[in-house]
Amino acid sequence: MMLLKRCNRRALVALAAVLLLAACGGARELPDLSDVGDGVATETLWTASTGSGSASSAYALVPAVEGGRVYAADSNGRVTAWDAESGERLWRVDTGRELAAGPGAGGGLVLVGARDGRLLALDAENGEERWVSGLSSEILAVPQIARNIVVARSGDGRVYGLDGLTGRRLWIHDRSVPVLTLRGSSSPVVVGNRVVVGQDNGRLVTLNLQDGEVIWEAPVSIPRGRSDLERMVDLHADPLVFRGVAYAQAYQGELAAVGMGDGRERWSRDIPGHTGMAADSRQLYVVDDQSRLWALDRNNGATVWRQDRLQGLRLTAPVVIGGHLVLADEEGYLNWIAPDNGDLVGRDRHGRQPIQRPPVPDGDVLYLLSADGRLAALRLVED
């Protein structure tokens, strides 16, 4: 169920919208996929528990893999590090806060965001607190770090650049947000010296990492309709930057490809969604608002194929690994798709809890986090 947030006006309409969406979600009919076999073989290397898991589907709690370690957090404030190969637990700390986003990892730091707007930086070696910085509202996007600058986004749409050593604020990008938006935020993407951000107003912006100045801003989708609900065009899915092109998808709007050099639109398609994207050398893969998976030509946006058999399931963003395409779903399955033709070649279940965030690939290993906090490391078994 998609959650909404309302700014500066009565919450009654937002509540009604949530109830309406919940009612629609309750009436969903799950597809019959009993004829689909196991597909791509995997072996479980290890499993572990992060603690309590995620308290909300709006939270961006997702594993981070960095320097031979896996980091994960739970809603109750625990952050844990494991050895990526063996699954040995290296450390665990209790931050004492309700965590809603992260971890982001890099530069010797593990970064997590809290419901109260606090951004916490922990030492990657031992979990000790390095610094805490207060942002303007809850943090629902995974913090990033590059060139010793931490980039974080708060729920009110502000983007911050912070000193990685001290947490001191270096810059802030502030844009007004629409009256009604989806709860949750797309995470910023750092590419070189640029920060790419999908905004709640349907625009994609690229900032200078050093000072937060706008390099370019491009409209992905324009609000339409009379009501606040109809006019929602959040870029809720994380932007994807691949080979010099930024891809962004709007809720109730368009999917667009924008050149990173000049911010000019390359192509646009009417494929609304809020989940996320993946790409390989030929194709862009994207899930629409009906849980249909599309493969598009990256150069012109033309449809290569569309897979409709997963309609009715709540899917994660697709992930490309080892020549395969995989998506997790709310029933605890991994769904394996053939990239060439879109065939559903297999499904395998990893527990009965929803998988709300995409698996994290690292080489030939997938790290999978269920809503109850079960973390699994799976290795592809090639024939």
From Swiss-Prot:
Part of the Bam complex. SMART domains: PQQ (SM00564). GO terms for biological process: Gram-negative-bacterium-type cell outer membrane assembly; protein insertion into membrane. This is Outer membrane protein assembly factor BamB. Belongs to the BamB family. GO terms for cellular component: cell outer membrane. Residues 1-23 form the signal peptide. InterPro entries: BamB (IPR017687), PQQ_b-propeller_rpt (IPR018391), PQQ_rpt_dom (IPR002372), Quinoprotein_ADH-like_sf (IPR011047), WD40/YVTN_repeat-like_dom_sf (IPR015943). Its main location: membrane. It is found in: Cell outer membrane. A lipid is attached at C24 (N-palmitoyl cysteine). Part of the outer membrane protein assembly complex, which is involved in assembly and insertion of beta-barrel proteins into the outer membrane. PANTHER family: CELL SURFACE PROTEIN, OUTER MEMBRANE PROTEIN ASSEMBLY FACTOR BAMB. It is a lipid-anchor. It comes from Alkalilimnicola ehrlichii (strain ATCC BAA-1101 / DSM 17681 / MLHE-1). Keywords: Cell outer membrane, Lipoprotein, Membrane, Palmitate, Signal. HAMAP family: OM_assembly_BamB. It comes from the Bacteria. A lipid is attached at C24 (S-diacylglycerol cysteine).
